[in-house]
Amino acid sequence: MNNYPWLTIITLFPISAGLLIPLIPNRGNNLIRWYALGICLIDFLLMTYVFGSQFDFYGQGIQLKEDISWINVIDFHWRVGVDGLSIALVLLTGFITTLATLAAWPVTRNPRLFYFLMLAMYSGQLGLFLAQDLLLFFFMWELELIPVYLLLSMWGGRRRLYAATKFILYTAGGSIFLLAAILTISLWGPNGPILDMETLSKQSYPLGLEILVYLGFLIAYAVKLPVFPFHTWLPDTHGEAHYSTCMLLAGILLKMGGYGFIRINIEMLSDAHRIFAPWLVALGAGQIVYAALVSIAQKNLKRRIAYSSVSHMGFVLIGAGSFSDLGLSGAILQMISHGLIGAGLFFLAGTTYDRSRTLILDDMGGWGSPLPKTFSTFTACAMASLALPGMSGFVAELMIFLGIVASSVYSPLFKAIITCVEGIGIILTPIYLLSMVRKMFYGYNDISLKTLKDSLILDASPREVFIILSLLVPMLGIGFYPDLTLQLWNQKAQEIVSLPSGNEKSLTLISYSYPVEKNFSLHH
């Protein structure tokens, strides 16, 4: 049972099943919808079963490994595995994609292609989180881009082609740096190309080479996360994409950058990370405030939510650079939490647009009375986004805050400045979120009154209520009992901060699990 290729099946099943969509009889869209939803649900249930029965939550290292030689001449293997860092993101991918497929029910134009692209995107994202080969990692990184571009360019707003072109230019540009970094690190040394991540993580590199490779990876991940100033594609993309696509972008795609940064830049290139981490922490703190201020100025609902995503990703940078397992665990939890919250906010923004036919906040108002279900669930998601105690966002941001404070690597002055800037961002967050809720659901203006009078507005359907409640339940569950998810990656976070990669490397890190500072070295 343990030797069964579960991860390969989980990865390839969606796209393989998607190839059968053209064979479905042309009897309307319902059959195609149910088929795509069934594929997503089966894959999600399968990964839940496999991880629940085969994964050792207290084990170390990569588990459920599969290694199949693919192209021998360049040592390219289908090499996949899962550990505490990737398991949560794989489960998040299955969960969000299943709900996004259900959210795409209103799509009627070319549904065969639409659902195939969603299933192809699903496989690409799963493959990236499970890849243990650098070239396979890059292959999945690129595979995921094609469906996203087509989903953006064919379904969305009037400026969807502009948004799709901007997205592909940014991400393709980042991919050039990603490929260059992969080739540099894999070809270094006398033993030929080495693409196995586990082998590469145990090697030592000259500091200059490590810095160069670190920067190459960082640029690629900075586009995807996104990090200022590589973030400008995100508001345009979210502003034009169909809301089911927005759920996939906010819920999963942004996490690919954070995952790659932790997996490669921190775990494999620890010496370079020690040099750049303070700058990234400062950049993350500045990004929180900058994106919050820009979000306040946005008049478009989806663009305001998009800039809130940029702001929240600043916390991921701070946690990843905190040099503490508490901060690193908080960064991972922030990615999971934002995946749920972002998907919920964009879904509700999209369903509100379907009813009001506007995304301009100044044209809204008074939607609370005719849309009580939408009002209550949107408010709940906004509360989770502003880190209300009892919601997942609060736990993640608190862990990151305490992680940077507990770090012994940084000076008290540096930590004081960062925490003060974080505090400013935390104060600004309710301003743009609560004002957004107020403009949408409270008060009236001439335009909103005319819309309310001229149209019969129905509240959220049972399908829509099910989707948003499915997202709210884990937000509350994590908020009240964070160990529900933290146990998935706490062990891995401690490994990363306590065992720097490479031979004869020494890095002073603090682990919140230990009472005193430790200096860890590896000698082989």
Swiss-Prot record:
MF annotations from Gene Ontology: NADH dehydrogenase (ubiquinone) activity; ubiquinone binding
InterPro entries (UniProt xref): NADH_Q_OxRdtase_chain4 (IPR022997), NADH_Q_OxRdtase_chainM/4 (IPR010227), NADH_UbQ_OxRdtase (IPR003918), ND/Mrp_TM (IPR001750)
Catalytic activity: a plastoquinone + NADH + (n+1) H(+)(in) = a plastoquinol + NAD(+) + n H(+)(out); a plastoquinone + NADPH + (n+1) H(+)(in) = a plastoquinol + NADP(+) + n H(+)(out)
Enzyme category, top tier: translocase
EC numbers: 7.1.1.-
One Gene Ontology term from the biological process aspect of the record: ATP synthesis coupled electron transport
Keyword annotations of the record: Chloroplast, Membrane, NAD, NADP, Plastid, Plastoquinone, Quinone, Thylakoid, Translocase, Transmembrane, Transmembrane helix
Keyword NADP set for record: yes
GO CC annotations, alphabetized: chloroplast thylakoid membrane
A Pfam short name: Proton_antipo_M
Membrane topology: Multi-pass membrane protein
Transmembrane segments: 4-24, 31-51, 87-107, 113-133, 134-154, 167-187, 211-231, 242-262, 275-295, 308-328, 330-350, 386-406, 417-437, 465-485
Record localization: Plastid, Chloroplast thylakoid membrane
NCBIfam families the record matches: NDH_I_M, PRK12561.1
Family membership: Belongs to the complex I subunit 4 family.
Protein name, per record: NAD(P)H-quinone oxidoreductase chain 4, chloroplastic
Native source species: Staurastrum punctulatum (Green alga)
Gene giving rise to this polypeptide: ndhD
